[in-house]
Every structure is written in structure tokens, then in C-alpha cells.
Regions:
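Histidine-centered active-site/metal-ligand motif
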Residues: 32-35, 39-41, 81, 151-153, ...
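Extended, compositionally biased flexible segments
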Residues: 37, 42-44, 51, 56-70, ...
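Short acidic-glycine-tyrosine-enriched beta hairpin
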Residues: 60-77, 171-188
Length: 215
């Protein structure tokens, strides 16, 4: 715990970092906290995505309410922001230590409302890929019984579930994924699995360059 937040984080082999903040109503997560606790991410792209609850967001001179599957992409570290949950809430931060410093405006979006669904895996999987300057983040929804296999790629990939389960394998190792665990896939490792019905995220660094992952 830190500052009233229950924090879980994982740093991958190519510096990809996924952090889960489980925040109680009334507590605050802001840019000062992130800068002081994650100095290695200063001036680096950070994508925040809400998977539970509602946040009151203050950003620069504006204020808004953010709910489930709302996300904000802070391209660099110059923005100031404050996120206050109006109920017990969960928000993820995705970044990478080895990202180059970037510039640009922040992007607010909702994965389900604003990101077009794509058929990346043949009909049984709804994928919504967001292409950032340095990261790719994909929300996926897998139907029960869906089987898939990827022959591998150079990009680091961290996969985790919001709900459901999936029997997963990577580089010959097998594991059942649920909302409490995930997998970090190594370079060019063959990976795949069978869905028991699941929704979750794939984060990639560097970002995917294939057309199907583009905006």
C-alpha cells in the first residue's frame, strides 16, 4: 500500500510496466504522486485506463468524469492531473521505462465507444487496438472455447484479464490466467490458448507496426 492505494505492478523484460491502482473512495491519484514514485517514467508516455468505478478527473484547466473503459494517454510528463474516485475504483497505468521522451497533446477516449472493433483472430475475439506514440494497448473480449495461436513477435507483450479465465501457453509453459495474474511473453515466443470466456488487455512495447494494429 502507498498513500492509501493498494498497488500491484509488473515490470517486463523490455521495461514494459503495468501498474494496477486499487483506490478507495475519496483518495487521490495525481501527477505529483506518479512523478515522485515513478521518476523513471517522467517525460514518458503513460496510458491510464479505468476498469472499475468512476473518477473525477482534473486536467490542466478542465474537469470531467471518467468511468469504466475510459482512458487517457498522457504523451509526456508536463501535464498536471488529479484523479479522485467517487467510489472504490481500479485504474491501470501502462508505460515503459525505455520509451523515448515524446511531445503532444493528451488523448481521452473510451475503449468500447471510441475504438473500432477489429477481427484480429477470426471471429471469436473482439479486439479494440489503441495505437499510441510508443505503446499499443488492446482490449480483447474472447468467446468461450475460442482457440488461438501466435507464432511470436519481437515486441514485448504483457497480457492480463479483467474477468474470466483462459488456459494459456507461451514458450512451452502452460498457465491458467484469471483476473489475479497475467503473462509476460518473450521475444518471438510462440503463444496461444483456449478461452473460458474472458476480457482483458494486451500491452505491447515497442508498439505494433502491423496495419491491423494501426488506427
Amino acid at each position: 500500500k502507498s498513500n492509501g492505494h493498494l498497488i500491484s505492478e509488473y515490470k517486463g523484460w523490455n521495461s514494459l510496466l503495468v501498474t494496477k491502482f486499487d483506490i478507495k473512495k475519496g483518495k487521490i491519484l495525481d501527477s505529483n504522486y506518479i512523478s515522485s514514485h515513478y521518476p523513471e517514467l517522467n517525460n514518458k508516455q503513460k496510458i491510464f485506463v479505468i476498469t472499475k468505478g468512476v473518477f473525477q478527473m482534473k486536467h490542466e484547466a478542465s474537469e470531467s468524469l471518467l468511468g469504466e473503459y475510459d482512458a487517457v494517454d498522457f504523451v509526456n510528463g508536463s501535464q498536471t492531473y488529479e484523479m479522485k474516485p467517487l467510489e472504490d475504483s481500479i485504474i491501470f497505468m501502462i508505460s515503459a521505462i525505455n520509451l523515448t521522451s515524446q511531445s503532444g497533446k493528451s488523448t481521452f477516449f473510451n475503449f468500447k465507444k471510441d475504438i473500432k472493433s477489429k477481427d484480429l483472430w477470426g471471429g471469436q475475439c473482439i479486439s479494440r487496438p489503441y495505437e499510441g506514440q510508443g505503446l499499443t494497448l488492446v482490449l480483447f473480449d474472447l468467446k468461450p472455447g475460442f482457440k488461438f495461436e501466435d507464432k511470436g513477435h519481437e515486441n514485448e507483450q504483457i497480457t492480463w484479464l479483467i474477468f474470466g479465465k483462459m488456459d494459456f501457453y507461451a514458450n512451452g509453459e502452460h498457465k491458467t490466467l484469471n483476473s489475479d495474474n497475467g503473462v509476460d511473453i518473450g521475444p518471438n515466443h510462440i503463444h496461444g490458448g483456449v478461452s473460458g470466456g474472458a476480457m482483458g488487455f494486451d500491452a505491447f512495447f515497442p508498439k505494433r507496426q502491423e496495419i491491423k494494429y494501426k488506427k
